[in-house]
UniProtKB/Swiss-Prot annotation:
GO terms for cellular component: apicoplast; DNA-directed RNA polymerase complex; mitochondrion. It is found in: Plastid, Apicoplast. The keyword Phosphoprotein does not apply. The keyword Transferase applies. Keywords: Apicoplast, DNA-directed RNA polymerase, Nucleotidyltransferase, Plastid, Transcription, Transferase. One of its GO terms (molecular function) is DNA binding. It comes from the Eukaryota. It catalyses: RNA(n) + a ribonucleoside 5'-triphosphate = RNA(n+1) + diphosphate. This is DNA-directed RNA polymerase subunit beta'. It comes from Plasmodium falciparum (isolate 3D7). One of its GO terms (biological process) is DNA-templated transcription. The gene is rpoC1. Belongs to the RNA polymerase beta' chain family.
Length: 575
């Protein structure tokens, strides 16, 4: 359930679903009539024509039509005058609008017996056992009809009439057989008759009387559960499934390959088996007095097991495949809730090794091209959206190519952007700072060496995480408070964090070395610009000796020096 006000989205709430709400979501209002989206047939499509079968798992009446402005009544591409005001076909009564409804329109299966939802039986709260005051093992014993499969005498093919006559004759012997025979219906009626307010008050009174720790813990759980049910307007019998919702047809599609061969999603097979068993159970219930009662019990057990496989999969098929199950979408690291709803930062973050780059300005950080292209991919797609000829797949392929125009777009994006850098473990505030990114080659983050003390980092393989601020408030905070030039002084001891590191001292020392062993091939230069030209083209190296022309009071001198001394002299002159 989505919670929102008139202005914007507030939050998301998970709740036990009301059966009436399932009918509302799956029904269509058409010409003062309500068309309910109940799936009756286990068939999916006609494999000869490739069209969905009526009242099946891909029915166009229930899940909306497949093609745009098209029907299955052999009348294609209607004139707009043939449509009603709401664009319904007059012949087959299908809705003729763009088929986006097929991705969110639900269907449902009307179950002939109420089936217990397995998450409320074996889940961490064990809701069913708390509500019914029964043990989980005993409830499993009831819903899977183990009483009839464990006792050999009930495996005999008794008729209902004979069974009830035996119950009347031997009441002591067959005392609890009714409870085991109609366990689903009896448990469902017990939950229907629960008054939540009276149960809550009774449990609170028992809590005052009881002194045992175990009983108190159990009563606390029950009181919390009843409070939750009352506050959220949940009825206890909703933990049983009267109606089984079916996912929209657009989320479990089928694809045509060739020679009348199709690929269909595995969840459709599970739904198909549930409908088959449900229809078979309906047939046995109709012929109850004329058949053996064990047939009905087998179908009830199989129906419960198939719905369990849909929720928590334990069934392995012959080809080592498994059915789709909904617990995968909520459990684990890559579940829908953890990965997509709670972990949205995963798509806008990265990690890389840091390497030294003294030529970079202290407030900047060198961001590799391959990281920046993945971080800013949604922004680049948004820029390319103005070209309507390109689809999303082609845009993403275009971005992955190292094109000059993409680099220009990236440089424009990075001009007013800040990225947050974190080094684990985050022991204090200085481990999280923001920098202005610059596009660089290679695969590592180019880091300013004097900023290492605040992060407690060095260049022996340390890794740093990259995060991209998205919201206006986080952008403002990263620009003002977290910025690197605002965190020069430590907040704990007021010391300058720009301390001279070992790397910095070694670098200055190497730039001051004058090696007289390289006396061969000493070049003569008239200007420093020419020396830099030779140095950048790898003709001269950092320790090579050179003679440079120096004029003082119209007197010409040639000074013997090295490239490294010229570099440090130039930097000292600039700064």
């Amino acid at each position: 359930m989505i919670i929102h006000n008139n202005i914007n989205f507030i939050g998301l709430k998970l709740n036990i679903l009301n059966p009436k709400q399932i009918i509302k979501w799956s029904s269509i209002f058409y010409k003062n009539k309500i068309i309910i989206g109940e799936v009756l047939i286990p068939n999916t499509i006609n494999f000869n024509t490739g069209l969905p079968i009526l009242n099946g798992l891909f029915c166009e009446k229930i899940f909306d039509y497949m093609y745009k402005w098209n029907c299955n009544c052999n009348k294609k591409m209607y004139n707009i005058n043939n449509f009603s005001f709401f664009l319904y076909c007059k012949f087959c009564k299908n809705k003729l609008i763009i088929n986006i409804n097929r991705k969110y329109k639900l269907g449902f299966i009307f179950l002939n017996i109420p089936i217990l939802h397995l998450w409320y039986l074996t889940g961490p709260l064990k809701v069913a056992s708390l509500l019914l005051n029964k043990n989980v093992f005993y409830l499993k014993f009831l819903i899977y009809y183990k009483y009839f499969f464990s006792n050999i005498k009930y495996k005999q093919y008794f008729y209902y009439n004979k069974l009830f006559s035996k119950i009347n004759l031997y009441k002591k012997k067959y005392k609890n057989i009714i409870q085991y025979l109609f366990s689903h219906n009896i448990l469902y009626k017990k939950l229907q008759n629960i008054n939540l307010l009276t149960e809550l008050l009774n449990n609170k009174e028992l809590l005052l009387i009881n002194n045992k720790y175990y009983n108190k813990k159990y009563l606390y759980k029950k009181i919390n559960l009843f409070n939750l049910f009352i506050l959220n307007n949940i009825k206890p019998n909703w933990i049983f499934l009267d109606l089984l919702p079916i996912l929209p047809a657009g989320l479990r599609p089928y694809f045509y390959i060739n020679n009348s061969t199709y690929i269909i999603s595995t969840i459709n097979e599970n739904y198909r088996l549930i409908i088959l068993k449900n229809n078979k159970l309906k047939y046995w219930l109709y012929l109850r007095n004329n058949i053996f009662f064990i047939f009905e019990i087998i179908e009830k057990r199989l129906l419960q097991q198939l719905i369990d496989y849909l929720l928590i999969n334990k069934l392995i098929l012959k080809n080592n495949n498994t059915f789709f199950n909904f617990s995968k979408t909520f459990q684990g690291k890559y579940s829908t809730i953890k990965y997509k709803l709670l972990g949205k930062r995963v798509d806008f973050s990265g990690r890389s090794v840091i390497t030294v780059n003294p030529s970079i300005i202290y407030n900047n950080i060198g961001l590799p091209y391959y990281i920046s292209i993945n971080l800013f991919k949604p922004f680049l797609i948004n820029i390319l959206k103005y070209n309507s000829k390109l689809n999303i797949i082609f845009k993403s392929l275009l971005i992955n190519k190292n094109l000059f125009i993409i680099q220009k777009f990236l440089n424009r994006l990075l001009q007013n952007q800040f990225i947050i850098i974190n080094r684990a473990p985050t022991l204090h505030r200085m481990n999280l700072q923001s920098f202005k990114p610059l596009l660089t080659e290679g695969y590592s983050l180019k880091f300013y060496p004097l900023g290492c003390t605040s992060f407690n980092a060095d260049f022996d393989g340390d890794q740093m995480s990259i995060f991209l601020p998205l919201i206006k408030t986080s952008k403002f905070e990263s620009n003002i408070n977290l910025n690197f030039d605002k965190n020069i002084i430590s907040p704990s001891n007021n010391k300058n964090l720009f301390s001279n590191l070992q790397y910095y001292k070694l670098g200055i020392n190497t730039l001051l070395i004058l090696n007289y062993n390289n006396e061969l091939n000493i070049f003569y230069f008239n200007s420093i610009e020419k020396i830099y030209e030779y140095y950048n083209n790898n003709i001269l190296f950092i320790f090579n000796l050179v003679w440079i022309k120096y004029i003082n009071n119209n007197n010409i001198f040639y000074i013997l020096t090295s490239i490294n001394r010229i570099i440090i002299n130039l930097y000292m002159y600039i700064y």
